[in-house]
Amino acid sequence: MEEVINGILIREVETKNIMTKSSLPVGGYSVNPYVGCTHACKYCYASFMKRFTGHKEEWGTFLDVKHWPEIKNPKKYAGQRVVIGSVTDGYNPQEEQFGNTRKLLEQLIGSDADILICTKSDLVVRDIDLLKKLGRVTVSWSINTLDENFKNDMDSASSIEHRIAAMKQVYEAGIRTVCFVSPVFPGITDFEAIFERVKDQCDLFWLENLNLRGGFKKTIMDYIAGKYPELVPLYDEIYNKHNRSYFEALEVKAEKMAKKYDCAFVDNEMPYGRVPQGHPVIVDYFYHEEIRGTENTGKRNR
């Protein structure tokens, strides 16, 4: 089936296996119920997927709805990290119609897997019933601003206020939550202000720097020149001259914030668990390509 719905080209595709071994620093399995993502984030690293899928359409204008054989033995993934939404958002608006992510969660019940859901949507609250049954589940929302105008410039996903409200609802349902401040835009993202808004409803507060590479580097640099011309010298230093001092200073700032609020400060994610309300673990995920295998030692792979 192929049709255009609300300006999005929708295809239904068959796949042999929905579970894919992950190359992410968090390891385990990467699971993407869709190909493509209709949030159309201007800075999206996942746009590189077009090289492998053969899509000619602009990123954000297409979505492949996957059909896969039912997961017959979910216990196979016991103790494994399963990341849902590494190169898509399983809760894109089309999920309301197709229900792929809900179907996936139903098939993973009883797996005892350590499930991480990455989203920019409030639709996830629909599935709180399943999240409770799954047990070891973490839901992460990307929130890198409190400014809805900047957010709207960057993506067409749920509003920041809706994401924060969904986080609160999921947290209060007893499910571990993450505020993923990603990507941190130099001179724009105020992570301390975001922390103040979410610290009582998240267990982890991740910080990741804006990476600019490939085709979207020019898109973002042009956006900064047009909307924030005063930041052009800073972006030139970071992204053309590869000066890391800005983000190194933010690391120091984040560690001070952790001490102020009596929060753990680590360079990778903690093992599954909850923390006292108001004291989320602050995760220094800046330059995360250096983190793999460090096991929170603070000694990165430079």
Question: Where are the regions a protein language model picked out?
Answer:
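Hydrophobic faces of well-ordered beta-strands that scaffold small-molecule active sites
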Residues: 29, 82, 115, 139-141, ...
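Anion (oxyanion) recognition and catalysis
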Residues: 109, 171-172, 199, 259
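Conserved strand-turn element in the central/C-terminal portion of the radical SAM core barrel
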Residues: 156, 168-189, 240-244
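Conserved radical SAM core fold
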Residues: 83-92, 122-125, 137-157, 186, ...
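Glycine-enriched alpha-helix->loop->beta-strand junction motifs that scaffold or abut catalytic
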Residues: 133-139, 199-204
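Conserved beta-strand termini and adjacent loop/short-helix elements that scaffold enzyme active sites
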Residues: 120, 142, 266-270
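Auxiliary Fe-S-binding modules of radical SAM enzymes
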Residues: 2-14, 192-302
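Conserved Radical SAM active-site core
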Residues: 1-138, 146-149, 160-161, 165, ...
